[in-house]
């Protein structure tokens, strides 16, 4: 009897181990199946090391890339190819965040049940992106050979409409790797971080709104310089006495340095974190770069950090989401690049992308920031430069040192669209990056 009991216990133990192992295997298959299926050694979907299946389209059905056994076929228009390089990818798979790398599992048509069976997946292995190829071309033209990036998304749906990074190359033309500029194979809006310059004053403003009493009555007298710990923070010109609206619209470095010092490093750190600027967003499995900040205990460094300098570095997409949250009363959709995928010939195989949302601000704070950003345009940048957009914006001039001209930033929103634009070494923000933003937004909103 005892032998039977021992055997029964042993059998049950082995059965339990088998079930646990089976559950673990199914879990691994579900989570990693697409990666395993799209491995380079799979001759069923690769030819001579090149992906031989799958296609990428823009939101309107424009073909951007089609993989065949004879090689990768790109759109016939060279401008579209250059403008969408960082979203679509190159033949050498150099851009890790591009569709032909990041969405490879979807392009091979992998399904948990059917695998990559060609009978069931057929020719419908396609990824429909959220981007508008024509909007990307407008951004590419507006940058006019200058290095930088343009990103626009619908803050209500999360769909990224425009995502351009320069320098770029034509993926359909073979290039000598030694002639490719540094940074060509990096999607800067997703994978890089930059000194934000005065765009960061929107973070300091949010912190001041929620932590400084009687901010509506606060004023600051700008004499063109502000001394902290025996060192000067300067403005390009004397602004005189300004309230918080005037301080932001004039981008007064002295006023904002004083606010940052008064608020303190702990508060500034809290708001950089809370507003999503140190977070990594998940864009359909693509992890964005995390911003980094150092709100030093030395007041002079804290003052510079409060105006977007010192060691401040922000990821462009994170800043764009913050703009969306200001537009959306404190909340915004998380960005996405996939509009839908078709993995199979079976009915109902067309799957739409869904985006979550983030809550970054109170509705009251967002409302005040909206009013102030609208005032920036009306009193400084000029509505006539952005006709019909009812633009809310903030410019930034980010000093990068090494004797180079500063980076020009322009970020904000118009209607349902939040944006961030940077022209590297472009000089003053509104003058260099503003026209780029206008051209792209005019196209998207027409």
Predicted regions located by residue number:
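Periplasmic/cell-envelope proteins involved in peptidoglycan metabolism and beta-lactam response
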Residues: 1-177, 184, 193, 266-274, ...
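Beta-lactam-recognizing serine transpeptidase/beta-lactamase-like catalytic domain environment
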Residues: 60, 156-192, 206-429, 445-446
């Amino acid at each position: 009897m005892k032998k039977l009991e021992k055997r029964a216990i042993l059998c049950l133990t082995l059965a339990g181990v088998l079930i646990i192992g089976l559950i673990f295997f199914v879990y691994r298959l579900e989570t990693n199946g697409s990666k395993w299926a799209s491995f380079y050694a799979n001759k069923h979907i690769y030819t001579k090391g090149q992906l031989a299946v799958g296609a990428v389209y823009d939101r309107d059905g424009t073909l951007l890339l089609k993989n065949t056994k004879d090689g990768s076929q790109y759109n016939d228009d060279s401008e579209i190819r250059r403008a969408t390089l960082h979203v679509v990818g190159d033949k050498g798979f150099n851009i890790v965040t591009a569709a032909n790398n990041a969405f490879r599992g979807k392009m091979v048509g992998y399904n948990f049940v059917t695998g990559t069976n060609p009978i069931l997946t057929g020719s419908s292995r396609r990824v429909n992106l959220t981007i508008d190829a024509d909007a990307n071309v407008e951004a590419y033209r507006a940058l006019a050979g200058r290095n930088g990036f343009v990103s626009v998304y619908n803050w209500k749906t999360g769909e990224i409409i425009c995502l351009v990074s320069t320098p770029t190359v034509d993926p359909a033309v073979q290039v000598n790797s030694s002639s490719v500029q540094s940074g060509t194979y990096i999607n800067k809006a997703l994978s890089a971080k930059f000194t934000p310059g005065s765009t960061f004053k929107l973070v300091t403003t949010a912190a001041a709104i929620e932590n400084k009493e009687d901010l509506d009555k606060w004023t600051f007298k700008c004499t063109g310089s502000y001394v902290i710990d025996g060192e000067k923070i300067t403005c390009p010109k004397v602004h005189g006495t300004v309230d918080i609206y005037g301080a932001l619209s004039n981008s007064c470095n002295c006023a904002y340095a004083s606010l940052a010092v008064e608020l303190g490093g702990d508060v500034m750190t809290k708001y950089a974190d809370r507003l999503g600027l140190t977070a990594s967003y998940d864009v359909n499995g693509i992890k964005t770069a995390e911003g980094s900040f150092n709100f030093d205990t030395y007041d002079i460094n804290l003052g510079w950090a409060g105006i977007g300098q010192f060691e401040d570095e922000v990821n462009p997409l994170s800043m764009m989401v913050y703009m969306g949250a200001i537009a959306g009363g404190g909340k915004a959709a998380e960005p996405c690049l996939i509009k839908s995928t078709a993995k199979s010939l079976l009915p109902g195989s067309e799957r739409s992308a869904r985006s979550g949302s983030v809550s970054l601000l109170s509705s009251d704070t967002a409302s005040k920031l909206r009013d102030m950003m609208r005032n920036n345009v009306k009193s400084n940048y000029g509505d006539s430069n952005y006709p019909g957009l009812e633009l809310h914006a903030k410019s930034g001039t980010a000093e990068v040192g090494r004797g180079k001209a500063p980076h020009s930033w322009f970020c904000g929103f118009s209607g349902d669209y939040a944006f961030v634009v940077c022209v590297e070494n472009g000089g003053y923000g509104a003058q260099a990056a503003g026209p780029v933003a206008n051209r792209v937004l005019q196209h998207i909103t027409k």
